[in-house]
Amino acid sequence: MDKEGRAHFRFYAPQASKLQVDCCGKKYDMWKDAGGLWTATTDPLPVGFHYYFLIADGVSVTDPSSYTFFGCCRVASGIEIPEGEEGNYYRPQQVPHGQVRSCTYYSETQKEFRRCMVYTPAEYETYPKKRYPVLYLQHGMGEDETGWSTQGRMNHIMDNLIASGKCVPMLVVMDSGDVEAPFRPRLGKDINEERALYGATFYDVILKDLIPMIDRTFRTKTDREHRAMAGLSWGGHQTFNTTLPHLDKFSYIGSFSGAIFGLDMKTCFNGVFSDADGFNKRVNYFFLGCGTEEQMGTKKMVESLCELGIKVDYYESKGTGHEWLTWRRCLKEFLPNLFKH
């Protein structure tokens, strides 16, 4: 990468006849020298994390010389265009570091073994009798349970906020939302009904399998006052569908660029928003955020909720779209408000 934010790619493939780099929605032709080394330079790229692919003779593949991530419904390569010092909140600093643990468990509802990722704060092993609140944090469509701790830098955000005293120590649990495959509505079916089915298997998993397993395995505070849920994009959709019908289990709710469409705020989820006083008393903190450059309808939703008297904290990430930089910023704004009521 150079100081103008352009990425320079080099790839050795002497037998390939055509190579391209697919990055940030644009395909760049690569040029081959006499020794079989291909090179390409991109336009200046926006800051933040971006997926990219190599296209070798028409076949899209990952870059074997870089780290891989699960995104775009497949294994992908990724590139980080660095911010300035304003991005230090998601970078590792000289502070105590927590752990991200990979946990395998059996889901009775799905009759399968599953994996979740669990962040424990740096002090977790130091205080063996202390119990912790829990945030359940969901990825978006086409990603999986690793997204928040790799693309999202969640663990560094947590470490830095806890060390600065802005955030209480907590566990963060990340599971697959069962939305790794693309959303493909069936022909002739109502689009909103099809959306309701996409990833719906996860709702019983989190309520009947995941939460009980976490409470058995880790030292958690098990009441609703110490349980939160948030998610990005389709994870925001899943957060609404999990928490709003089950406010007996959650008291903190967050949606980052939530894929929440076609809802009548007065009647959705059995009219949960129609009783503003009741909702505001039960939900300790309600957060909605998005980027200024995306069109997810979040701001209009906030306006509708405010008209009904719902207390909601709204955040806009300036200059960003439907991307990980937006969601990192949303998480940074959301976390300091948890478990302080």
Give residue ranges: language-model regions.
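Non-catalytic cap/lid and distal C-terminal segments of serine-dependent acyl enzymes
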Residues: 1-28, 32-341
